[in-house]
UniProtKB/Swiss-Prot annotation:
This is Thiopurine S-methyltransferase. HAMAP family: Thiopur_methtran (MF_00812). The gene is tpm. InterPro entries: SAM-dependent_MTases_sf, Thiopur_S-MeTfrase_Se/Te_detox, Thiopurine_S-MeTrfase, TPMT. Pfam families: TPMT. The lineage of its organism: Bacteria, Pseudomonadati, Pseudomonadota, Gammaproteobacteria, Pseudomonadales.
Length: 218
């Protein structure tokens, strides 16, 4: 899965993964990240999610990383924001009060970019990637995050043979395998969400679970 795939999805407005509401899991469980006002949270592969503005409204400093320039531009336009734009290493950096978006390749992210980061929130990053990229993504995320980080991770699971991703099925054992080294993993929620996901129903998926994890690096 190359960059051109995602650029084409955004160019053609094929963004079924974008939610027109704040993620309810985020609202329910943000407090578990134990963040204080002014502390920074990373949102990898953030798209133009409304969660960015909501997190900033909670008093946090939000750092999003997104490949698509259109997604980043759309976010600021739809929120009627006029960001300062400059370059930071290999990224185009967009900044307004409380929100910084780095437009570019997630794998170009370096530890110094996240030196002030306390936590991360992943709703649509891990599940957006095919198996061969997920391990690389999780490894790179852990390599650049500071020690003693926390994370809120949302995944889905379904019979992968019944539908081609994205979004991809990420079973529980896979999550625990990626974060086995030095992370405490707590499953906060798991539930059947097939009935409210028409895309999966139309494609004949027989079951669909959504899970939320709290990750803590000790």
């Amino acid at each position: 899965m190359q960059a051109d795939f995602w650029h084409a999805r955004w160019a053609n407005n094929q963004i079924g993964f974008h939610l027109d509401e704040i993620n309810p899991y985020l609202m329910r469980h943000l407090s578990r990240l134990r963040l204080q006002a002014g502390e920074q949270i990373l949102v990898p592969l953030c798209g133009k999610t409304l969660d960015l503005a909501w997190l900033a409204a909670q008093g946090l400093e939000v750092l999003g990383v997104e490949l698509s320039e259109k997604a980043v531009s759309d976010f600021f336009e739809e929120h009627d924001l006029r960001p300062e734009i400059d370059q930071l290493d290999g990224f185009r950096r967009y900044r307004v009060a409380g929100i910084t978006l780095l437009q570019g390749d997630f794998f170009a992210l370096q530890a110094e970019h996240l030196a002030q980061c306390r936590a991360f929130y992943d709703r649509a990053a891990l599940i957006a990637l095919p198996p061969e990229m997920r391990e690389r993504y999780a490894g790179h995320l852990q390599a650049v995050l500071p020690t003693r980080s926390l994370g809120l991770l949302v995944t889905i699971d379904y019979p992968q043979a019944e539908m081609a991703g994205p979004p991809f099925a990420v079973p529980d054992e896979e999550v625990r395998g990626y974060y086995a080294g030095g992370w405490r993993i707590e499953e906060l929620e798991r539930g059947d969400v097939l009935g409210v996901n028409w895309k999966f129903l139309e494609r004949g998926v027989s079951w669909l679970d959504e899970a939320v994890y709290l990750l803590e690096r000790g």
